[in-house]
Amino acid sequence: MAEVAVGQASDLVPSEMDHEVIYSHLQGPLEGTIEPATPTEVVSNGAPLQPAPAELANSQGGAHVQPAPAEVVSSQDGLPTLQPLPPASIDLTEEVQPSEENMEVVNPGTSEEPSQGSGANPTAGAARSVSMNNFISGLQRLHNMLELLRPPPADHSVGPIRTRRRMAPILRARAGESQRQDNGRYVPHTPLYAYFQVSRSQPYPLPAAHDSETRNPPSGTDSDSDGSAEDEEVVVQAEEPEANIPEQGVIATDQEATSVTGDDAVPKESPQKPNMLSAMEDEEGETCTICLEQWTNAGDHRISALRCGHLFGFRCISKWLKGQTRKCPQCNKKAKHSDIVVIYARSLRALDTSEQERMKSDLLNEQMLRKQAELESAQCRLQLQVLIDKCTKLNSRVQDLEKFVVRHQNSAAQQCSRSKALCGKCLSSSQSPGKYSSEKTFTISQTGKCRILAYCDGLSCLVASQPSPQASFLPGFGVKMLSTANMKSSQYIPMHNKQIRGLSFSSQSKGLLLSASLDCTIKLTSLETNTVVQTYNTGRPVWSCCWCLDENNYVYAGLASGSILIYDLRNTNTYIQELVPQKARCPLVSLSYLPKAAVAAFPYGGVLAGTLENASFWELKSDFSHKPHVLSLEPGGFVDFQTESSTRHCLVTYRPDKSHNTVRTVLLEMSYKLDDAGEPVCSCLPVQTFLGGPTCKLLTKSAIFQSPENNGNVLVCTGDEASQSTLLWNAGSGLLLQNLKAGEPVLDICPFETNQNSYLATLTEKTVHMYKWE
């Protein structure tokens, strides 16, 4: 198809009369008229409009070939078929001189006369069709040239508007007109102004848009014959407010007008969509969720609410609750007809207060944090004031101490000289101590088997364990009472069936004696009435016993298995606690209680338990629980363990072994240190060692006590089997003070005071020796 220059456009403009004649010619029903098979595509950006000229063929005559880009073939059935037209492009840069071939002025009046006769020549009809097609092509080229001169639109923001129309009745009507029995000629039915239905605001597109926007949908002949309904989709560019788009009265086939700007297609969303969405959102708050109709502020469909707060029309919710489902349609909460509440309001809108609520929540959080910060600030100020006051007091105390040091600086030398004199006096007193002299000897048992001594300060009597003096009449073991007031022996008190291994008097109850025996019992005996007041069956042989000096209602019993049973005198049935050793299970040869004291060196109280192989200190807690502390002692055969409460010392006696040929008695100082958890760990440090004889066959007992001179010295008294005597040592210096002969191995030693005199009693298997301090 040739291009027409702008200067020649005026020659192609038809007159007004020509337009009217052509329009009437195209609109009139003609015999043999064929509907175009391909929809005409109108491109508003200036793309060429293809008018679809055809090659007309008859089944009885020859074909007349016309220079047209489309071909119309009539089959034997009489139904014409229009072949698709190839897309044509126009090159506006090439100048083409108009000629008779591409430009032909047709007189519509002369072309119409032969068409109305019955014997029309097919050749003349084809010539008229070609002339009409050439004329339409000229108009199309003129339209394209005018589009080049049109200025671009000012606003491209308005998108295309797509509308759909049902064209099935029109298509069926035209399909009936197009089917005729006689030969016909091709006459286009599309009105001329359909080619000019283009928006004036569309810019001229790039050449590349022609191929992408031009499409040929398949033929609609079959759809027309079947009579099916088809949708027509028309997309037109939204024009300016002053532009008017004429309505199409009759459209032969599906027509699609597409607005293209450049290479990219304009979106097909309607510019009114946001407004429509907002309108829909507004309607959602004004419609009943049951019938989806707007509620009213009066009548039977007025606004009503349930207890759950959801809104409905009164008629709808009343009918809903009268049915089987008596629940809210939205939240499914149970409801009844009496729950309906009518709301008297003209309109109801939900106010979005989420941001306001969030700001209120943030405000409350900030206020809470501010109050917390103010409280912390007040606490810090209070602590600061307390620290300032404390610092002021400490500064004043430091100043007082400085004054005190200056005031007593001159008297420091005098105090030093006094201390030296006191030390010399103590040294002289240790070099010349007092001595024990023999006071009296008591024969306790003719057969022997005496084991333990104990002194009762309240009754001023000394008791010694012995077998029954009348074994045939009253077998068993008991104690023999010795009066320290007149140094005379008293009566015998029977207690156990087997040998007694431990005796201990209560410091709170007068004359109450605790005894432990190998007959698996411990007993409480009142010396005031000479009767046994309480018996506890331990189930195992008992080797030692002692009282709890911090809680006088509790007693300890050391078993042959190494365990310690704790009894409460208020519970007469059984023991309340058992202390199981952590190491080897050996008989507890000694139990000695160390009371609590306000001493920095070792303030803790507990029981010192010694077996034949090791020793442990069971610390007494505030809840009367006991924490074990295994003492790290030198390995060897242990014989006896004793404690001294005022100096927090303990005394341990060892048998001879391979490393040591003699009996050793070691003085230990109790101490402690804190672990990582802040709990004390008890230990003992050796202070002095006292050596005895080379033999130790019996389980003898030793004693540690304060010096009768009350000079702060500590004395240690041990028995020596080899010399059959009692050895008295100075614990501070380690010197042997005295050797008291007994004639038999000494089994137990008991110091006591009575009538303002200090005595020392030693026990052998048969006798008791009394020594007085002078």
Swiss-Prot record:
- Pfam family example for this protein? WD40_RFWD3
- Which organism does this record belong to? Mus musculus (Mouse)
Q: What is known of its domains?
A: The coiled coil domain may be involved in RPA2-binding.
Q: What does this protein do?
A: E3 ubiquitin-protein ligase required for the repair of DNA interstrand cross-links (ICL) in response to DNA damage. Plays a key role in RPA-mediated DNA damage signaling and repair. Acts by mediating ubiquitination of the RPA complex (RPA1, RPA2 and RPA3 subunits) and RAD51 at stalled replication forks, leading to remove them from DNA damage sites and promote homologous recombination. Also mediates the ubiquitination of p53/TP53 in the late response to DNA damage, and acts as a positive regulator of p53/TP53 stability, thereby regulating the G1/S DNA damage checkpoint.
The entry summarizes the disruption phenotype as follows: Mice are viable and do not show overt phenotypic abnormalities, although there is some evidence for increased embryonic lethality, earlier death, and subfertility, associated with testicular and ovarian atrophy in mutant. Mutant mice embryonic fibroblasts are hypersensitive to DNA cross-linking agents and show increased chromosomal breakage compared to controls.
Name the pathway it acts in: Protein modification; protein ubiquitination
Q: Which PANTHER family match?
A: E3 UBIQUITIN-PROTEIN LIGASE RFWD3, RFWD3 PROTEIN
Indicate where this protein is primarily found. nucleus
- InterPro entries in UniProt: RFWD3, WD40/YVTN_repeat-like_dom_sf, WD40_repeat_dom_sf, WD40_RFWD3, WD40_rpt, Znf_RING, Znf_RING/FYVE/PHD
Q: What gene does the UniProt entry assign to this protein?
A: Rfwd3
The entry's protein name is E3 ubiquitin-protein ligase RFWD3
Q: Which superkingdom is the protein from?
A: Eukaryota
User: In residue terms, where are the WD repeats?
Assistant: 493-535, 536-568, 583-628
The answer to keyword Repeat applying to this record is: yes
Tell me, which GO biological process terms does this entry list?
DNA damage response; double-strand break repair via homologous recombination; interstrand cross-link repair; mitotic G1 DNA damage checkpoint signaling; protein ubiquitination; regulation of DNA damage checkpoint; replication fork processing; response to ionizing radiation
Q: What is the lineage of its organism?
A: Eukaryota, Metazoa, Chordata, Craniata, Vertebrata
What subcellular compartments does it reside in? Nucleus; Nucleus, PML body; Cytoplasm
Post-translational modification, as annotated = Phosphorylated at Ser-59 and Ser-75 upon DNA damage by ATM or ATR. ATM phosphorylation occurs at early times upon DNA damage, while ATR is the major kinase at later times. Phosphorylation by ATM and ATR is required to stabilize p53/TP53. Part of the phosphorylation depends upon RPA2 presence.
ZnF endpoints (RING-type): 288-332
Q: What's in the keyword line of the UniProt record?
A: Coiled coil, Cytoplasm, DNA damage, DNA repair, Metal-binding, Nucleus, Phosphoprotein, Repeat, Transferase, Ubl conjugation pathway, WD repeat, Zinc, Zinc-finger
EC number(s) per entry = 2.3.2.27
GO-annotated cellular components: cytoplasm; nucleus; PML body; site of DNA damage; site of double-strand break
Its recorded reaction(s) are: S-ubiquitinyl-[E2 ubiquitin-conjugating enzyme]-L-cysteine + [acceptor protein]-L-lysine = [E2 ubiquitin-conjugating enzyme]-L-cysteine + N(6)-ubiquitinyl-[acceptor protein]-L-lysine
Q: List every position bearing Phosphoserine.
A: 59, 75
Q: What class of enzyme is it?
A: transferase
